[in-house]
C-alpha cells in the first residue's frame, strides 16, 4: 500500500450525495440519555411549555427548545462553561450532533442563538425543566426527601474588580484615589495624574481602606457583589446554595443569591424552595431534618425554623470566646438553641454531619468543578440562575443514568470499563493462584518425601505471580 500524503490546499466538492456524508456510531452515553429523555416525552413536553413564548404561526421556525436544553446539558457533561465552547463542541462532534438531532446537512446552533433563546424563555421555564428531571428521579425511587443537607459556595462573576465604580460619584478606582491624594495635599489640582505605582503606594498607606458593596458597584454586572472566594482572593461573585437529599445525593434545590447574603439569611428560603420542588415533582414526602455547617447557625434562624416550620435542624455552633448570655433574650430562643445543640451532639446528629459533608460537597464538585459552573460567563443574576438550574438538573440526570446504566457521565463509561477489567483480572489471578496451590498439594500427596514447607513456598510464589 502506498503512503497517502496530506495536501496543503484541497478543492472541496461542489456536491456530496447523502451516502457519502460522514457517519458516527454515536456515544453510548448520549444514546442512552436520549433514550431516557424520549421515554419521558421530553421534547413534546418542553415544546408545549415554551410555545406561549413564541409567535404563533409567524416567522421562521426557531431552534427547537429540546435542542437548546440538550446543548446546556452538553455543557455540564463535557465540563464547558462558556456558550462559545458549547457551540464549538457540538459543531465539531458527530456523536453530539446525533444527540441533538441535527441532520448532517444542517449547521449546529451558534452561541448567539443560545443567548437569544435564554433571553426569550423566562426563569420559570428553566425551573420547570429542573422539576421535570426531579419527577424522573421520583418515578425511579431516587428521591427520599426526609433528610436534607444545605451548603453554599461562591461563583466568580463575569466582571472584574478593576471595573468597579463609586455608587455616589461614579468614580473608578484611579479617579477615587487621585481625589483622595488631592484632598490630602499630596498633589495639586493642576498636577499631572499620578501613575499606577504612586496610586498603589498611596493605597497601601491608607488606614481606613474599605471596599464595601454599599459604596462600590460594577457597571458591567450590577447584580454581582464583592466577596471573598474560597481561595482567599476577592472577586465579584454570586452565591450558589444547594439543598441535597442525604438519602440519594439528588439536588432538591439550587438557588443563586447575591454574594453578600449571609448563609443564615438564605437557609429558610432554600428549604422552602426544596419542599415546593418535591411537591411539584410528585413526592408526598415532607422535609423533616435539615443539616448544615456552623456558618448557618444564628439564634434568630434556629428559633424561626423551630417556631414557624416543621424542619428539625442539626447545625453545629461556632466556637465563642465567652459563654452565651440569655438574660436579655426571650426564653423560646434559648430553648431552640439548646434543642439544636442536643440534637447535633447526639449520635444521629454526628452521622448527619458526616453525610452532609460528603454529599453536599460532592454536588459542588460535580456542578462547579467538573461541570464548569465555578466561573460564570453570563451577566445578571437572572441569567446565572437559568444556567445554574440546568447544570443542577444535569447532575440529577447523571444520578439517574448511573442508576440505570452504571455510568453518570460520558467519561464514566471508560471508568466503568477500567473497573470491569480490573475485576476480571483479579478473578483470573485468584483462579490461577488456586490452581497452582491444588497442583502443588497434589504433588506433595503423591510424593511423601516433599515437605509441607516446599508446598507452602510454591503456594506463596503462585500468589505473588
Regions found by a protein language model. Give the residues of each.
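An anion-engaging/catalytic patch
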Residues: 47-49, 94, 110
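Short, flexible loop/hinge motifs at secondary-structure junctions
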Residues: 1-23, 169-171, 180, 413
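A detector of single, family-specific signature residues
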Residues: 50, 87-88, 98
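Short amphipathic alpha-helical interaction patches enriched in hydrophobic/aromatic residues
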Residues: 54, 75-76, 98, 118-121
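Anion-binding and metal-coordination hotspots
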Residues: 81-91, 102-465
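Basic, short loop/linker segments at the boundary and entry of helix-turn-helix/winged-helix-like folds
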Residues: 26-73, 78
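Secretory-pathway/luminal and periplasmic proteins that interact with or process carbohydrate-rich
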Residues: 95-101
